[in-house]
């Protein structure tokens, strides 16, 4: 995990740790001129590790984005940002995307009052994301929300009610709110 962060830079969804500033300078001095292949590979790896995708899943999303009208890169990022695990992370209900995946896999999350246990579930506008009415589920989410430092900077396509453990997807994400810097 730390090797990946040192190599690719800060990945907020992957872990809350940040690379030290001195290691960035060493990497740049050591690496020399980057080839086009290396730049594209690093950007692809950033996407994979940040969103927790396998190679096959990423290829599937690229294929869907290629068929849609508009910029393939922007549509790809919109598809990835509208995944359930990522929306839980953005709402502050989980500290990292892998943590959000675990919440979904362990059936703590309801979408429109139905249990969803698939982290890659594609959320749509007007979806209501809540926790189960069990005490354990509410305690887990409450701990994450209380310890969440980025609660103020909630993207404008999401709203959260921390007292009812409820989040709402208002619209498809706007490009300026995508948290990952991709070249």
Curated annotation (Swiss-Prot):
Subunit organization: Part of the 30S ribosomal subunit. Contacts protein S5. The interaction surface between S4 and S5 is involved in control of translational fidelity.
Alphabetic keyword roster: Chloroplast, Plastid, Ribonucleoprotein, Ribosomal protein, RNA-binding, rRNA-binding
Function: One of the primary rRNA binding proteins, it binds directly to 16S rRNA where it nucleates assembly of the body of the 30S subunit. With S5 and S12 plays an important role in translational accuracy.
All copies of domain S4 RNA-binding, residue ranges: 82-143
GO molecular function: rRNA binding; structural constituent of ribosome
Protein's recorded name: Small ribosomal subunit protein uS4c
The species this protein was found in: Aristea capitata
Matches recorded under InterPro entries: Ribosomal_uS4 (IPR022801), Ribosomal_uS4_bac-type (IPR005709), Ribosomal_uS4_CS (IPR018079), Ribosomal_uS4_N (IPR001912), S4_RNA-bd (IPR002942), S4_RNA-bd_sf (IPR036986)
